[in-house]
């Protein structure tokens, strides 16, 4: 019996919606990364994008454990000398709640063209509304 290798034209990408209300950031991000990569499918192939589309709603209501809300630092650089900026989890949730999920999940995906295609399949929204009703996403309880 031969090992089956998925071909890009044969892969079916489903749409799922995940509610982040009251969920822990890391545990939710690992499951999202696994589904974006397609490792939950029997047709998983490392060099083919077999993952699903994930819509994350209520990103502003995600939680972290311990003192990470104040202690966890996020860094960015303005590309000017001395332009290193830092913020903590609490401030970033108030300002850009979508960026928290993008940073958490992006670090769990492969680097390179395939990983960049996978991260584009994740749509994150701060509130409970999303514009993807036409795709008829299924509710995914994590």
UniProtKB/Swiss-Prot annotation:
One of its GO terms (molecular function) is structural constituent of ribosome. It holds the Pfam family Ribosomal_L13. Transmembrane segments: none annotated. GO terms for biological process: negative regulation of translation; translation. Signal peptide: none annotated. It comes from the Bacteria. The keyword Ribonucleoprotein applies. One of its GO terms (cellular component) is cytosolic large ribosomal subunit. Keywords: Ribonucleoprotein, Ribosomal protein. Part of the 50S ribosomal subunit. HAMAP family: Ribosomal_uL13. This protein is one of the early assembly proteins of the 50S ribosomal subunit, although it is not seen to bind rRNA by itself. It is important during the early stages of 50S assembly. Belongs to the universal ribosomal protein uL13 family. This is Large ribosomal subunit protein uL13.
């Amino acid at each position: 019996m031969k090992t089956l290798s998925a071909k890009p034209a044969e892969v079916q990408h489903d749409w799922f919606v995940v509610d982040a209300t009251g969920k822990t950031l890391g545990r939710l991000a690992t499951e999202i990364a696994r589904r974006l990569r397609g490792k939950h499918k029997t047709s998983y192939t490392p060099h083919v994008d077999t993952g699903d589309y994930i819509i994350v709603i209520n990103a502003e209501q995600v939680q972290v454990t311990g003192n990470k809300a104040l202690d966890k630092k996020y860094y960015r650089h303005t590309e000017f000398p001395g332009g290193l900026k830092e913020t903590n989890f609490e401030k970033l949730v108030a300002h850009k709640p979508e960026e928290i999920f993008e940073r958490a999940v992006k670090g769990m995906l492969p680097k390179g063209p395939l990983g960049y295609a996978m991260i584009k399949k994740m749509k994150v929204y701060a509130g409970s509304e999303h514009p993807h009703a036409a795709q008829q996403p299924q509710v995914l309880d994590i």
